[in-house]
């Protein structure tokens, strides 16, 4: 059996797959996604020699390094396999380094039905249930550290979050898991909250099945209704995603204008709530720039995480704004702004859901959900 190790950059083979390279009885092929290079390590070659052969492929930091796509990777995999038995090792689709996560997803799609094992890799937010754990002995760890110190010094010094090498990214135990197509896609989408890839699957944050999310949403609806009953006028929900909150509000009797700029999310929102809510494509910035959608209140529920200027609220055509955020983000962003602004006052603050640990992606991983605090802002005469 040929071991095919598909990585973004050459150093990844030593950092995340040293235990694979150490299986000297197997022929091992390393595929570098950023350059398309293929390194063949014959069976019987000791680990030290294999690392020496890998070292010249280590490149300078390149922020443009990216997966070449499943089609290009499939060609490399087929060349390496040569029609014989092979297994593929690659990055986790949920690797926090998105360049690696994308390559891991693409490589699995390129495997052609061969067995695939994903390295857990860099995962500061998720704890994984792995299928194969390989603790390195002291000699293995020493070999990994020596490779980094000799050939990756620039990666120890770089400011690039995608490519920097730190203690937590140099694993003494290499952990791997197998995943089917749906699980891979859900893992990839879960870590994509800041980009368009979050919409590649339905319900990426598992609102429909999460007890934590159900409690948060139900409590949020009750909180809104306690201050702004359904007959108060329409609500404008900004960043409605697929409508988990929208449908609850409609069921409570509210008239809802739900806005969602992501086309895929908006399509699902319309399918789920379009018969009962009015759907709009504007972002918060667009709503503030052209305040043509008045409401009894605006809802900014779990969406001020992406660097938006809180000053945009000044231009929204409503005197009440409901905001919900996790406690740390609330303390770091909204609270200081609220202390400075003369235009808004805090009319209410209450916990909506307590922090909890929860399994995700069918139990493949779990994470800490940090709780949510609701803050009602009322416009002042300032």
PLM feature spans:
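Conserved SAM-binding loop of SAM-dependent methyltransferases across substrates and taxa
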Residues: 242-252
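Conserved beta-strand signature within the Rossmann-like core of class I S-adenosyl-L-methionine
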Residues: 318-330
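The feature marks non-catalytic terminal segments
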Residues: 2, 43-54, 65-71, 113-195
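Class I SAM-dependent methyltransferase Rossmann-like catalytic core
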Residues: 200-215
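Class I SAM-dependent methyltransferase SAM/SAH-binding core
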Residues: 252-276
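Active-site beta-strand->loop->alpha-helix modules in alpha/beta enzyme cores, enriched
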Residues: 1-116
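Conserved alpha-helix/loop element of class I SAM-dependent methyltransferases that forms part
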Residues: 212-230
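Conserved class I S-adenosyl-L-methionine
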Residues: 232-241
